Amino acid sequence: MSGPPFRRTAMRASVLFEQRTPLKVEDVELEAPRAGEVRVRMAASGVCHSCLHAADGSWTGVPVPIVLGDEGAGVVEAVGPGVQTLRAGDHVILSWAPTCGRCHYCVIGRPNLCEQRRPGQGVLPEGTSRMSLGGRPVYQYGHVATYASVTVVAESSAIAIDKNMPLDRAALIGCSVMTGVGAVINTAAVPPGASMAVFGVGGVGLNAVQGGAMVAAQPIIAVDVVGGKLESARQLGATHAIDASKEDPVAEIRRITRRGADFTFVAVGDARAVAQAAEALAPGGTCVVIGVPATGATVPLDVRPLVTGERVIRGSSYGSARTREDLPRLVELYRGGRLKIDELITRRYGLDEANEAFRALAAGELARGLIVF
């Protein structure tokens, strides 16, 4: 093993004991990394809607007790046997989508769909958690559990980056930036000059707007019900903003584009937004669904326009990421001034303020909140 040897250590983590109850900061025991795993001391973690949905019960079946957090960055402290790509001292972005490199999807170049991925089950790829409390297992949300001062993750969940990249900014690349930018560039492959609309411009949606600006989409239309978010979208590249609480977004998109949008992106977990985004498509257009609605949500759709207009509705999981290539590339885009991250960070919190971060996120007050350690 590289790095200081240990068998078990205590660290501080924000634990969800039951859905619909507040998080509690506890001293949680952390087991040493096993074969193919690494121990990471966290620098920062983003506050993501997926974690809010897990906590507030929107998503059912979340195992408890569990340490939430699915995007973050930190420094490798130790590595387990067989680790090849990392060593103690490396700066890493954590990814909730580990890859095995051997399954059907990894082999065909779609590692974000790896068959070993099980983020909702609260365990590492080999099937267990490295965290415990009073002898009871504590689950690790999204394979990484970033609401902890220290965590153990699979080697493929930790992507080494340039040490000159600030770790608090790097934390957001691990999910919201990758998911939003990747949906535009990887999943949809939006060409220059194509029109696009983004429904929901929170953390992920703002990054979809940024992705559109990177590929020179025109126009880029932001849709939300919160005025402050629409203003942020304009700062990040949106050419038009629609307040869906005051205007019909479908009618406005058609007015702006004259025929409907070539691409629409749904970056909010709302089935109604999916229906609107599909209706706003131009013939031949593609609706990309990024946000995951509450468990059991369904979308009423008029199928005829899909067929006669050859419109497409498809999902985008994690921005169709190839993490080992895409995450370092996003770091370089930030360092080169082409990707804005500082502007995404609305507020910083300590670990003991995670409940307040969730409240602010639910109230629409945050583009992205950041827990710093």
Predicted regions and their residues:
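C-terminal hydrophobic helical "lid"/dimerization subdomain
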Residues: 3-9, 255, 263, 275-279, ...
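Residues located in well-ordered beta-strands
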Residues: 12, 24, 29, 41, ...
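Glycine-rich beta-strand-centered segment in the early N-terminal region that forms part
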Residues: 31-45, 58-107, 112, 160-164
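Cysteine-cluster motifs in flexible loop/terminal segments that predominantly coordinate metals
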Residues: 96-150, 154-156
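Mid-domain Rossmann-like dinucleotide-binding core that forms the NAD(H)/NADP(H) cofactor-binding site
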Residues: 149-150, 156-158, 162-247, 251
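Glycine-rich phosphate-binding loop and adjacent beta-alpha segment
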Residues: 270-338, 366, 372-373
